[in-house]
């Protein structure tokens, strides 16, 4: 996985430099759409077929996305470069790194919140507000439910984890008692 990140990083950084000259959010949408299309087994199969030219593969990828940026020269050149270098499979990792660069520029971060129970509305807003104060940045939350936590939440922001779940507390107590 780290190897894919290393290979994808220069592509994500180059695309981000291009995006800085325009609408970063629109470029983010484009690269997310390209990543979704490139992740499809059918597309990967067509891309590796010797009967299909590289130009046709690039056109297939661009036609499959809805973003109006796909018609632009920069997007066409980017996709063609990925196809020529056999890097289509890297698009999901490129999209992830592009999003990280975008978040860094905005002073934001993705927050993965795992809760024992569904979080919605004011409860979620209150939690996110508190987490933003703790992490000192704007958070973009995604919420998952995992009943095995018993209660509480586990929050992951970048490489930081805040685990206030009952399961984590029980594990901590067990470790203290058996030590």
Swiss-Prot record:
HAMAP family: ATP_synth_delta_bact
Main location: membrane
Membrane topology: Peripheral membrane protein
Subunit annotation: F-type ATPases have 2 components, F(1) - the catalytic core - and F(0) - the membrane proton channel. F(1) has five subunits: alpha(3), beta(3), gamma(1), delta(1), epsilon(1). F(0) has three main subunits: a(1), b(2) and c(10-14). The alpha and beta chains form an alternating ring which encloses part of the gamma chain. F(1) is attached to F(0) by a central stalk formed by the gamma and epsilon chains, while a peripheral stalk is formed by the delta and b chains.
Protein name as it appears in the record: ATP synthase subunit delta
Gene3D superfamilies in alphabetical order: N-terminal domain of the delta subunit of the F1F0-ATP synthase
Keyword annotations of the record: ATP synthesis, Cell inner membrane, Cell membrane, CF(1), Hydrogen ion transport, Ion transport, Membrane, Transport
């Amino acid at each position: 996985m780290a190897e894919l990140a290393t290979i994808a990083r220069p592509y994500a950084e180059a695309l981000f430099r291009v995006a800085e000259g325009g609408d970063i959010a629109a470029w983010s949408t484009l690269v997310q759409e390209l990543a979704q299309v490139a992740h499809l087994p059918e597309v990967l199969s067509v891309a590796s077929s010797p009967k299909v030219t590289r130009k046709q593969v690039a056109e297939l990828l661009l036609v499959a996305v809805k973003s109006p940026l796909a018609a632009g020269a920069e997007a066409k050149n980017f996709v063609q470069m990925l196809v020529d270098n056999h890097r289509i499979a890297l698009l999901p990792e490129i999209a992830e790194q592009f999003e990280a660069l975008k978040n860094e520029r905005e002073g934001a971060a993705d927050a993965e919140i795992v809760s024992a129970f569904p979080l919605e509305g004011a409860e979620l807003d209150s939690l996110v507000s508190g987490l933003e104060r703790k992490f000192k940045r704007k958070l973009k939350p995604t919420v998952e439910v995992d009943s095995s936590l018993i209660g509480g939440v586990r929050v992951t922001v970048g490489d930081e984890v805040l685990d206030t779940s009952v399961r984590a507390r029980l594990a901590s107590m067990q470790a203290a008692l058996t030590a």
